[in-house]
Swiss-Prot record:
Membrane topology: Lipid-anchor; GPI-anchor
Domain Ig-like C2-type residue range list: 139-223, 230-323
Positions bearing carbohydrate: N45, N86, N308
UniProt-recorded name of the protein: Protein amalgam
Range of residues in the leader sequence: 1-23
Entry GO CC: extracellular space; plasma membrane; side of membrane
Domain of life: Eukaryota
Amino acid sequence: MARLRLLIGLIFCLAISLDSVLSAPVISQISKDVVASVGDSVEFNCTVEEVGQLSVSWAKRPSESDTNSVVLSMRNILSLPDQRYNVTVTEGPKTGSAIYTFRIQNIEVSDMGPYECQVLVSATEKVTKKLSLQIKTPPVIAENTPKSTLVTEGQNLELTCHANGFPKPTISWAREHNAVMPAGGHLLAEPTLRIRSVHRMDRGGYYCIAQNGEGQPDKRLIRVEVEFRPQIAVQRPKIAQMVSHSAELECSVQGYPAPTVVWHKNGVPLQSSRHHEVANTASSSGTTTSVLRIDSVGEEDFGDYYCNATNKLGHADARLHLFQTVIPVPSLS
């Protein structure tokens, strides 16, 4: 008799367990991930079997990595007062099943993200499945993309352009004024611009261009400044002049940061005075033209002059020689 009671008890427990398994809610189907444009209407469907009296809700998570969700609806009642939202519950294809449909009209960028269909089994247990809503947005270059950069000549340079948008934007690079890229060509289809052993000729503006087929491409001009030692060019290293006439000595200086230019004679720096005038003119190309003008040249003004240019990377000198010339007197014979 005791064995019979034990057997009956085991059968009863097994029946309860089996009934519990058979009646557990199951999300048998959920809509696939959705891709839409701003202003469209979207619809999510979630089919739940063995739902019984359990509560089924739609919820939105801020991101894939954030597990906290905001409940949007519970059964057929909206939890948030948004006129764009609508939720309905209809009978499912199987007995005891139901389809929970959540609709959003006139979607906005803020609607993008993961959505969950949730079946609340108990206070600590729920059955969930999720889908993702991706919204097509035109490319926007991110703020963490630099607007300028500084590099010393001879170093390597890497510039990475970041852009947001969906589909994921493609990045390309082009030089300002359609100039040739350091590696050749006029366009580089890479997110990162790499220049090995930067040269001063690489300085200038580079456009980061982002495009994904949605709206207009976005672009940003990034200024590349290259630091380099001063370099001096002299077109006329020897200047002939007569006494009592004016003379001009000229040198062209390049360098970054812009060098300080000083003229010397006999180791003494020359400054603008009644006898000497120094004029420095900077051009848009980064070249400084320095002119030393001497009014009414005297005997003591002849000799060597030095154009000296200095910046934080070094200095350069160029020698110019002012010598006396005379007008030949024609012979009377």
